[in-house]
């Protein structure tokens, strides 16, 4: 039997499809999401409706974003979900979540079992809409969740950690084994909750500057910042900010990255592109 077929649908590798089928795991995720009637719930990648059905049971309306044409068509004709659903058959990377929030009249509650091949770029896309999002619950590769929650001085800490924690409070919810999926992925999975900060703990003047600094620092993470960021900061400037030039990218806190970004915004602002 082909273990890529589930409920009559052949999982497409190019869409990174792995379908959740463990009832205990599904119930645990739905409990963590705790959907309520009247909320603007949005699911990314509903697939074969493993989460869509139990979430939809609790709601009058549910918005879903599904790239796979066949799966979108199945949802359209779903016996009890169909009338409740607003289906966008498109790539979530092209979705304007700000416009969607405005249409629905409130901040979005976004959830989904995300395709692992696009999870990181999709996170960055969603971070740009955090003012339109109340919270997010995602199933991700466990290694990605570890990176999202990691603090300084750890191997998992990187650009994704800094940017996620700049925008959101990041809370691990539960770990999920490969056996909970069809076909089973080759990696462990985990569910994470991301809650955009109501008030930014470390506001930056220009997010593009923070993005540039973290990219340059972590692209050369084995170098000291004296070297990796030497084109942006002198040793004297780093020292004045209380940042040791001998530290590496992984030793610098989110607050310190934001401090560096604001210094650069004030003293060498990026030109408008």
UniProtKB/Swiss-Prot annotation:
User: Binding positions for S-adenosyl-L-methionine?
Assistant: 18, 20, 45, 66, 91, 113
Give me the gene this protein comes from.
rsmA
Family, per the entry? Belongs to the class I-like SAM-binding methyltransferase superfamily. rRNA adenine N(6)-methyltransferase family. RsmA subfamily.
Reaction(s) catalyzed by this protein? adenosine(1518)/adenosine(1519) in 16S rRNA + 4 S-adenosyl-L-methionine = N(6)-dimethyladenosine(1518)/N(6)-dimethyladenosine(1519) in 16S rRNA + 4 S-adenosyl-L-homocysteine + 4 H(+)
**Name of the protein:** Ribosomal RNA small subunit methyltransferase A
What sort of enzyme, by top EC class, is this? transferase
Q: Which PROSITE patterns does the record associate with it?
A: RRNA_A_DIMETH, SAM_RNA_A_N6_MT
Q: What are the record keywords, sorted?
A: Cytoplasm, Methyltransferase, RNA-binding, rRNA processing, S-adenosyl-L-methionine, Transferase
Q: What does this protein do?
A: Specifically dimethylates two adjacent adenosines (A1518 and A1519) in the loop of a conserved hairpin near the 3'-end of 16S rRNA in the 30S particle. May play a critical role in biogenesis of 30S subunits.
Subcellular location, in the record's words?
A: Cytoplasm
Q: Which organism is it from?
A: Salmonella paratyphi B (strain ATCC BAA-1250 / SPB7)
């Amino acid at each position: 039997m082909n273990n890529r077929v589930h409920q009559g649908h052949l999982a497409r590798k190019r869409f990174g499809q792995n379908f959740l089928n463990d009832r205990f795991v599904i119930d645990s995720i739905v409990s963590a999401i705790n959907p309520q009637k009247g909320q603007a719930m949005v699911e990314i990648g509903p697939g074969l409706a493993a989460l869509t059905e139990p979430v939809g049971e609790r709601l009058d309306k549910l918005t879903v974003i599904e790239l796979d044409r066949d799966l979108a068509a199945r949802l359209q004709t779903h016996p009890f979900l169909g009338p409740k659903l607003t289906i966008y058959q498109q790539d979530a990377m092209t979705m304007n979540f700000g416009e969607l929030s405005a249409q629905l009249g409130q901040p979005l509650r976004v959830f989904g079992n995300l395709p692992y091949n696009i999870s990181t770029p999709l996170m960055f896309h969603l971070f740009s809409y955090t003012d339109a999002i109340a919270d997010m619950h995602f199933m991700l590769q466990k290694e990605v969740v570890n990176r999202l929650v990691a603090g300084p001085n750890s191997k998992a800490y990187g650009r994704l950690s800094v940017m996620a924690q700049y925008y959101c409070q990041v809370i691990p919810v539960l770990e999920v084994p490969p056996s909970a999926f069809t076909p089973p992925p080759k990696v462990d999975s985990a569910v994470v909750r991301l809650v955009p900060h109501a008030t930014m703990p470390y506001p930056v003047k220009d997010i593009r500057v923070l993005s540039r600094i973290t990219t340059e620092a972590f692209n050369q993470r084995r170098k000291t910042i004296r070297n990796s960021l030497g084109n942006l900061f002198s040793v004297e400037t780093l020292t004045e900010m209380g940042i040791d030039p001998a530290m590496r990218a992984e030793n610098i806190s989110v607050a310190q990255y934001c401090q560096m970004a604001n210094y650069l915004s004030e003293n060498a602002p990026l030109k408008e592109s």
